[in-house]
A protein has these predicted regions:
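Cytoplasmic membrane-interface "Motif A"-like loop-to-helix N-cap segments
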Residues: 77-89, 259-272
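C-terminal transmembrane helical hairpin of 12-TM major facilitator-type secondary transporters
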Residues: 265-302
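C-terminal ends and interior cores of transmembrane alpha-helices
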Residues: 89-107, 272-284
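Intracellular juxtamembrane helix-capping segments at the cytosolic ends
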Residues: 124-138, 296-311
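Helix-loop boundary and gating motifs at the non-cytosolic
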Residues: 2-61, 221-233
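Central cavity-lining transmembrane alpha-helices of secondary-active solute carriers
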Residues: 54-73, 241-253
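Conserved MFS/SLC helix-loop-helix module at the cytosolic interface between two early adjacent transmembrane helices
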Residues: 66-98
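A late C-terminal transmembrane helix in Major Facilitator Superfamily
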Residues: 311-342
């Protein structure tokens, strides 16, 4: 049941991101993406000014990601997530179902801005409330986190590329996922044992400022460095889809790799190799995409390590990591970062992730070196 729930919530992640991003692109009026311009790049067609487009995208990012720490704190304090999960999924689905037949929005105005805020709120609430159920399955393993966060990238790409066509279908998928979650008994009773365990667990510090600062720094510079990495070819439709698939594969693999080889291995091997591929092989699509996959293996790792930094406020930690990743990516769009600096930032990010467990008084469950022998794991199971 738990594995099915994680898989369903991952699919819901795809549907939610596709719905909200599709609305953003319908709102800003991008008519076509992927057509080659005279310069050989992607052609964008919009009746709105660049400032208006930037304001809409920035507002969405700040609300959808910036509110997650506050939603996470609410979930941690109230120890409830199911009502938020269903409200966000059904809310986004219903709003999309109303917008499409009404041919809305027609432009950027007060009403469309209000709907944008609503979709952003749904996105923020969904990520944390759905994440709460995945976090409950990630007390001693990182893999569920990787599976959950992986498909969001695919949803963003589909919403970005096919905004007018997929809005209604994406909203319907949100509602369908909510119905499926009801069938799988995704309720607050399922979370109660998790909250009880972390509530009575002995911890040396409720908030580890040193590891939290390292992880916040790591996700910020990773977002900054990753967004600034050069790409030596046109961002056409096929590439956007392939990049999303590789991103999803990397995030999913990162959790399993951390469980098998330790979080330090992912940080100190995958990130440096990814930086080399993305910088020095950026003109070769296959190698660049491989680097992109390796680059994203660290995402579930940083999330999982943040739970040791805030052991009783894990949903808050989840939101904090998401918020600072967004801030790094947004900052990268506002400044010019040379390739060598982006390369260095990715390496620094890996070092910060690897260092975080060593300055934390609350040690993570996953081995930092190599997995335990299978025989030892079987003997542990017999003792239980």
């Amino acid at each position: 049941m738990a594995k099915l729930r994680v898989a369903l919530l991952s699919a819901a992640h795809l549907a939610m991101d596709m719905t909200t991003v599709a609305f953003v692109y319908v709102l800003i009026g991008v008519r076509e993406f992927g057509a080659l311009s005279e310069a050989g790049g992607a052609a964008w067609y919009s009746p709105h000014s660049a400032a208006a487009i930037a304001a809409c995208v920035l507002a969405y990012d700040l609300l959808a990601f910036g509110l997650q720490p506050f939603v996470g704190a609410f979930v941690d304090l109230k120890k409830r997530a199911a009502p938020l999960l269903y409200a966000s999924l059904f809310g986004a689905g219903l709003c999309a179902a109303v917008c499409v037949p009404c041919d809305f929005p027609q432009g950027i105005g007060a009403a469309s801005a209000a709907i944008l805020v609503f979709f952003s709120l749904c996105n923020a609430v969904f990520h944390v409330s759905a994440g709460a159920f995945v976090i409950a399955e990630s007390e001693k393993k990182c893999a569920p986190l990787g599976v959950f966060v992986s498909l969001g990238a695919v949803g963003v790409a589909l919403g970005r590329l096919y905004a007018p066509a997929v809005l209604f279908a994406a909203g319907a998928c949100c509602a369908a996922c909510a119905a499926g979650a009801l069938f799988l008994k995704t309720n607050d009773q399922a979370l109660a044992p998790h909250f009880e365990r972390i509530g009575r667990a002995e911890v040396k510090e409720n908030v580890g400022l040193a590891p939290l600062a390292l992880l916040v720094f790591a996700v910020f510079v990773r977002g900054l460095g990753g967004a600034a990495m050069p790409s030596g070819y046109a961002a056409d439709e096929l590439y956007v889809l392939l990049a999303a698939i590789c991103t999803a594969a990397g995030k999913a693999a990162g959790g399993f790799l951390a469980d098998a080889f330790g979080t330090k291995s992912v940080a100190l091997i995958c990130l440096p190799v990814s930086a080399c591929l993305m910088l020095f092989a950026n003109g070769i699509p296959a190698l660049y995409l491989a680097g992109l996959a390796l680059f994203n293996t660290s995402m579930p790792v940083t999330l999982w390590l943040s739970f040791a930094a805030m052991p009783r406020m894990r949903n808050t930690a989840f939101g904090v990591m998401a918020c600072f990743l967004m801030l790094g990516s947004v900052f990268a769009m506002s400044v010019s970062v040379p390739g060598w600096l982006a390369f260095a930032l990715v390496l620094i990010s890996g070092a910060a992730i690897a260092a975080a467990p060593h300055v934390s008084k609350n040690k993570p469950e996953i081995s930092e070196n190599m997995p335990r022998p299978r025989k030892a794991r079987k003997e542990e199971g017999k003792d239980v």
